[in-house]
Amino acid sequence: MNQRVAAIDCGTNSVRLLIAEVDPRRAVLTDLAREMRIVRLGEGVDRTGRLSEAALDRTTAALREYVGLIGRFSPAAARMVATSATRDAENSQEFVDRVKEVLGVAPEVVTGDEEARLSFTGATREIAGTPLARADCCPPPMSVTR
């Protein structure tokens, strides 16, 4: 039986939402909705070590938009991951608390290795059996995954 799922990826510059239907028998995802908002969550983190109030507000506003879309599709499961900007910020708990207030669940703040693994899996999911390498240069330093 197919199942609807939602995934939110909150990076340094953008927040992406995917709502999909999963066919577990064939391991196939069918996109139902895809959204992306430029929020610049990591703006200034390298200089100040903190997520700015403006960046937190932009990101929270994008997540509020996503809540409406998620509600229309009623997924059985949802997951949100947050990457380097959240991981590196001194006030990351403030971000986690805001997300929990908006979405009802806390984001998973993933390690750099997990971020690379998830990114590689997403980029290569439909290219099975082909030797590949993926380079990610945002934010610095650049990471390469094979």
Task: Please state what every model-predicted region is.
Residues M1-C10, L18-C138:
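Nucleotide/phosphate-binding catalytic cleft detector across ATP-hydrolyzing
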Residues V144-R146:
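Acidic, divalent-metal-coordinating active-site segment for phosphoryl/phosphodiester hydrolysis
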Residues P141:
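Rossmann-fold dinucleotide-binding core
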